[in-house]
Regions:
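ABC transporter nucleotide-binding domains
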Residues: 13, 20-200, 205-211, 215-219, ...
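ABC-family P-loop ATPase nucleotide-binding domain
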Residues: 1-19, 254-267
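Compositionally biased, low-structure terminal segments
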Residues: 8, 23, 31-34, 214, ...
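ABC ATPase nucleotide-binding domains
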Residues: 234-267
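Residue-level preference for well-ordered alpha-helical positions
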Residues: 110, 128, 233-234, 246
Length: 267
């Protein structure tokens, strides 16, 4: 199946008892949920909760210790190449080949996905225009010399270049300026309207509350809540998603410790 072949499926992402262990430590424990076409799902949790480990399993970077998962009907273990063709992934690290120019990197990504140069170049130019990048800079400057924001824009372009039906974003706004952030939020909402499944992992909870129509919160590798942000906030009498998050994940205790610590600086 080519990178532009339509993938007709309702449940884009399906997890059943997905588990990941590192030695005696269980990083992700028995996660089960489904994500449908057109959903933007905020995947939330404190540091060390298992979010990135889960995303790495779903994108084929890590192998699960137990359980199963499918991406658009393709099993992670038995159809890994079909899974990779079906997803776009913007990792938190945003690692790139620093010895390539931005254009060389994007053309390489297009070739890896089997996109003909005559098709890849116009797509790249569309993203360059959207992100207000310079073609001269992309062509002549190595990625190692790019700012963090420019590098992030290139990584996002690479993730979307093959038009995947499922996209995973891990802290996607990191390094983007205010204007680019606004444009990016509009972009993912438009992608969802086109039927793509978007998984959005971020610590910027007010953005998640505005952009996502569903949130999944995990802690210590276990699922805590799953539902529409406004419904979860109302159900727990939290007022905001941020307060719900801190109530569920022990953030109130950390706030109290921070206040006590700050008082030690008072004369």
């Amino acid at each position: 199946m080519g990178p532009d072949s339509p993938l007709a499926c309702t449940s884009m992402i399906s997890l059943r008892h997905l588990t990941k262990r590192f030695g005696s430590q269980t990083a992700v424990h028995d996660l089960s949920f489904d994500i449908a076409a057109g959903e933007i799902v905020g995947f939330l949790g404190p540091n060390g909760a298992g979010k990135t480990t889960t995303l790495k399993m779903l994108t084929g970077v890590l192998e699960p210790s137990a359980g199963t998962a499918t991406i658009c009907g393709f099993d992670l273990l038995t159809s890994p190449m079909d899974v990779k063709r079906s997803i776009g992934y913007v990792p938190e690290s945003g690692a790139v080949y620093e010895s390539l120019s931005g254009l060389e990197y994007l053309e390489m990504i297009g070739a890896l996905y089997g996109i003909a140069p005559a098709v890849a170049r116009p797509r790249i130019e569309q993203f360059i225009s959207f992100f207000d990048l310079s073609m001269d800079t992309l062509r002549s400057k190595l990625l190692g010399g790019y700012s963090k924001g420019m590098r992030r824009k290139v990584v996002i372009t690479a993730a979307l270049l093959h038009n995947p039906p499922v996209v995973f974003f891990d802290e996607p706004l990191e390094g983007l300026d205010a204007n680019a952030s606004v444009g990016f939020k509009t972009l993912i909402q438009t992608l969802a309207k086109e039927g793509k499944a978007i998984v959005y992992s971020s610590h910027i909870l007010d953005v998640v509350e505005r952009v996502c129509d569903r949130v999944i919160i995990i802690d210590k590798g276990k699922l805590l809540v799953d539902g529409a942000p406004d419904e979860l906030v109302a159900e727990h009498n939290s007022g905001t998603l941020e307060k719900l998050f801190t109530d569920l994940t022990g953030g109130r205790e950390l706030e109290a410790r921070a206040e006590a610590f700050a008082k030690t600086f008072l004369p």
